[in-house]
Amino acid sequence: DHLAARRRTDLQQLLPAGPKIAFTGGADCADHAAIWDALDRVRAKHADMVLLHGGGPRGAERIAAAWADNRGVTQIVFKPDWTRHGKAAPFRRNDQLLQVLPIGLIVFPGSGITDNLADKARALGIPLFDFRPKPAPA
């Protein structure tokens, strides 16, 4: 739709240059080595990448933020607006992050909010680098 396209164009002008790579993972995910390795592999292909994440205070997103600080990678943090959106805040945050149209999404284990972001990204045709455990065959 026209308004969404215009909003996206306006948003793109405000963002730093470089391919946008989104990252998501839960507060209980603490696999530093795997997260740093995944981010290093993506950065090897996209040296000027910009990391998009939810700014979680602990867990996978905190580890990704520490990686970006260490590697000098630009970050854009999409924090949930709890005051404005209440319980829907993390889902609205997911929608805002995807409006940037990242070229890929790195997914580590998390909650239903993590799965929601992965599902929406897949529906938009955004490639997933999925590090969640595979379900056991039934």
Positions of predicted regions on the chain:
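Positively charged, aromatic-accented nucleic-acid-binding surfaces
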Residues: 26
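Acidic/glycine-enriched connector segments
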Residues: 1-21, 29-138
